[in-house]
A protein has these predicted regions:
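C-terminal regulatory/interaction regions
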Residues: 257-315
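Divalent metal-coordination and catalytic microenvironments
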Residues: 16, 35, 45, 60, ...
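Acidic/histidine-rich helix-loop elements
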Residues: 20-28, 107-117, 197-207
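Short, exposed beta-strand/loop patches in secreted or surface proteins that constitute
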Residues: 3-12
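Short Pro/Gly-enriched beta-strand edge/turn motifs at strand-loop
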Residues: 13-18, 134-140, 160-166
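Metallo-beta-lactamase
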Residues: 40-42, 46-51, 156, 163-254
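Active-site HxH/HxHxD metal-binding segment of metal-dependent hydrolases
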Residues: 52, 58-149, 156, 175
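Conserved beta-strand hairpin/beta-sheet module of binuclear metal-dependent hydrolase folds
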Residues: 11-62, 178-191
Length: 315
């Protein structure tokens, strides 16, 4: 595959297949996709706020003639707001997600994120870190729309004559991650199973599921692989994500067995080549999730504390 420049905007990757890219691929700067055939259109994910989503939909309409009200289906690859907060901008669309993602969306509405951001400057280093990474987004201007159709396992859709396969691979990054595969066009939209040139963040785990999800992507033999964040990639990019996951699992396990705390382990792990990836401080969340996995602890993490640790590691 010829390398596609990582520039903001819409790129046609195949016949009626488009990726919308948002550099730099860091916190909140996610990718989306459009699949169009025979007068039907499916949108893969929306963006972190309504303004960004409307801008994207305008670019898509100008390039393809497919307007917001022409989109019949939105597929959310997972529950995070940077992939869902613009769902309501497509008023006529059915919204499809995994059952697990639908539950997660209901648990953290945008209003809660807006409330946290309103208090962020009073939250010390963790709050300042939140301002630094999320200050560009307007969580008071969102267009939420809950899934109207959910599934587990796999779901096969048709967009015109194109077959679109939804493949559940979570829990991994989140509880309900899915892949969107267009087999005839050898294209897969991976959601946040792939962060390319950025550090993966594991909110859910287990890590083995995420590694297996990467194997599933490889097995699809897609020629165009659109990640949730970062530039369009190929199998090499998928394997590098696997390398990272295996490495941090190995390194976190050593420190867990040695009795180090999450904080000490996150500071102690040397990232080597992976240190050049953006947002390397996400090691804090990854170690926390791995430690809870090792301990069989299913309780929710202290998210504010984790953002504080990421702020500390960022310095």
């Amino acid at each position: 595959m010829t390398a596609i420049p990582f520039e903001k905007g819409l790129v046609e990757t195949g016949d009626g297949i488009y990726a919308y890219l948002q550099p730099d691929g860091g916190w909140g700067w996610s990718n989306a996709g459009l699949i169009s055939d025979g007068g039907q259109s499916l949108l893969v994910d929306t963006l972190f706020d309504a303004s960004l989503t409307r801008e994207m939909l305008g670019v898509m309409a100008d390039a393809t003639g497919v307007g917001a009200d022409d989109i019949g289906v939105i597929v959310n690859t997972h529950a995070n707001g940077d992939h869902t907060h613009g769902n309501g901008c497509c008023r006529k669309a059915e919204v499809v997600a995994s059952e697990a993602s639908a539950r997660e969306m209901a648990e953290l509405p945008a209003s809660e994120l807006a409330a946290i951001m309103a208090q962020a400057r009073a939250m010390g280093p963790a709050g300042q870190y939140l301002v630094d990474i999320f200050g560009s987004f307007d969580f008071t201007d969102v267009a939420e729309k809950a899934p109207t159709r959910t599934f587990t396992g796999e779901l096969n859709l048709k967009v015109g004559d194109k077959r679109v396969d939804l493949i559940e691979v979570g829990p991994a990054h989140t509880a309900g991650d899915i892949l969107v595969h267009v087999p005839d066009d050898k294209t897969v939209f991976t959601g946040d199973i792939l962060f390319i040139e950025g550090t993966p963040i594991m909110w859910a785990g287990p890590v083995a599921n995420w590694i297996a999800a990467c194997d599933r992507i490889i097995d699809l033999k897609a020629e165009t692989i659109v990640p949730g964040h970062g530039p369009i990639t190929d199998v090499h990019g998928v394997r590098r994500v696997q390398d990272y996951l295996r490495y941090i699992d190995q390194e976190a396990r050593k420190r867990y067995d040695a009795g180090l705390s999450v904080r000490d382990a996150a500071h102690d792990i040397r990232l080597g080549d992976f240190s050049s990836w953006g947002d390397s401080e996400r090691i804090a969340v990854n170690v926390s999730t791995l430690y809870r996995e090792y301990a069989g602890d299913t309780s929710a993490p202290d998210v504010v504390q984790l953002f504080g640790l990421m702020a500390e590691l960022k310095q």
